[in-house]
C-alpha cells in the first residue's frame, strides 16, 4: 500500500512425521488485520502446494492470540532447567565437528518426531548459531549446542541416549570453557532427559490444513528465529 510493505513473512518447507508442511518465518506486519490477511494468504498458498500443516514461533502474546484466531494451537513446549556441572577430567567429547547435514541426522536419530528443516536451511541456522558464539559438543551418545555467559553454559539444544551421556557432554564443555560451574538447559517438554525437572514454557504453534495428527510428543527448536 502506497509503496510500503505492510506485512511480511517467509514460508519455509519443513517435514514432521513423514508429512510435508511449512514454517512461517519472520511474521511481522503493521496492524492485526493486515497480518491476519497475510497468514490466510500464505496458508492457502502452501495448502495448494500440498502442505498439510503450518508451524511458527510467535513473537509474543499478541501475535499468539492472532494466530489462535487463525486456527493455530500451541504445540512443541519446552522445559528449562538449571544444573550444576561437575568437574570430570575423564569426560571426553568433540567440539564444533557437526555439519548441517550431520545435525539433521542427529536430530533424526535422537528425536525422529522433530520438525525438520532440510540440510541447506539448517546450514543457515548453524551459521547463525556459530556467528552468535555457539559451540557444539558431541559424542557417540549425544550432542549439545550451547552458549557460554560468564560461569554458565546455556544449552539451547541437548539430545543424548541417557542422563549420564548428557552430563558427560556438559562436563566436557566445562573442561573446555574452564571457568564454568553450572548450566541452564532447554529441552523438549516430553524429552526423556532429566524427566520431571525444570519449568515448562510454550514455544511453537501449529495449524493443520490437512488431516490433524498427534503432536503431543513432537519437538521443534532452532527454527531460524534467532
Segments and roles (model prediction):
Residues 54-57, 116, 138, 145, ...:
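A structural signal for short, well-ordered beta-strand segments and their strand-loop junctions
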Residues 57-60, 64-92, 159-163, 171-226:
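Active-site/acyl-donor-binding loops of N-acyltransferases
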Amino acid at each position: 500500500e502506497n509503496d510500503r510493505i505492510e506485512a511480511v513473512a517467509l514460508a519455509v518447507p519443513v517435514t514432521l512425521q513423514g508429512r510435508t508442511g511449512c514454517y512461517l518465518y519472520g511474521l511481522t506486519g503493521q496492524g492485526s488485520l493486515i497480518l491476519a490477511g497475510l497468514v490466510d494468504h500464505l496458508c492457502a498458498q502452501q495448502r495448494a502446494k500440498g502442505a498439510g500443516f503450518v508451524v511458527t514461533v510467535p513473537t509474543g502474546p499478541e501475535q499468539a492470540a492472532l494466530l489462535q484466531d487463525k486456527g493455530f494451537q500451541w504445540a512443541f513446549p519446552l522445559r528449562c532447567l538449571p544444573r550444576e556441572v561437575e568437574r570430570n577430567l575423564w569426560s571426553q567429547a568433540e567440539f564444533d565437528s557437526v555439519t548441517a547435514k550431520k545435525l539433521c541426522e542427529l536430530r533424526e536419530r535422537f528425536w525422529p518426531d522433530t520438525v525438520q528443516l532440510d540440510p541447506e536451511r539448517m546450514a543457515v541456522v548453524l551459521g547463525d548459531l556459530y556467528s552468535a558464539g555457539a559451540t557444539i559438543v558431541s559424542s557417540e551418545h549425544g550432542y549439545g549446542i550451547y552458549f557460554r555467559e560468564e560461569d554458565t553454559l546455556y544449552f539451547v539444544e541437548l539430545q543424548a541416549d541417557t542422563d549420564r551421556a548428557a552430563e558427560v557432554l556438559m562436563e566436557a564443555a566445562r573442561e573446555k570453557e574452564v571457568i564454568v560451574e553450572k548450566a541452564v538447559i532447554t529441552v523438549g517438554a516430553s524429552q526423556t532427559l532429566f524427566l520431571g525437572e525444570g519449568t515448562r514454557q510454550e514455544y511453537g504453534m501449529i495449524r493443520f490444513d490437512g488431516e490433524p495428527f498427534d503432536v503431543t510428543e513432537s519437538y521443534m527448536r532452532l527454527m531460524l528465529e534467532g
